[in-house]
Amino acid sequence: EEMLFYDSPRKDLPYADWYLNAMSYPDSVTAKHHAATYGNAPYADFKPVFEQRLSEAWDPEAWADLFYKAGAKYVVLVTKHHDGYTLWPSAIANPNRENWGSPRDLVGELAAAVRARGMRFGTYYSTGLDWTFQLVTEGDRIRDIMRSAPSSQSYADYAYAQIVELIDRYHPDVLWADIG
């Protein structure tokens, strides 16, 4: 029997980076967790909470110290994952979500802290999935989820412009374009 993608909790699921997609499946563990914990609050409602916690707890200097003490030679930050939220105040506006990005430059702050300690800095950018452009909720196997990959020219232009912006602003030593 083929295992369903969201049929049971795992160490990295269901409350992690694919949360927005997973909560859209009504019978998934994530959807049940979300309903029990947050009611019917939409995913976008977490943006103010995230930004408030950032203002209180984000300490890129402490992160860089930890990486340096661990012997890291480089650090790669997820600058935009599949939910489309950017960790820098991008000049390239998301056409489907207003103000869908951090007002604080988390990428720049961590890049400066990492480089000040002699480590290299890289950026990860989800090129192949952005659920603010397309979220497929039919099916529950990984092959069905991959149908969420946006294929429009508007998305290609948007992603390209943001990647150019990342390169121009941060000069990453590593540029990781996921699923693209």
What are these regions (language model features)?
Residues E1-G180:
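Mature catalytic domains of secreted/periplasmic carbohydrate-active enzymes
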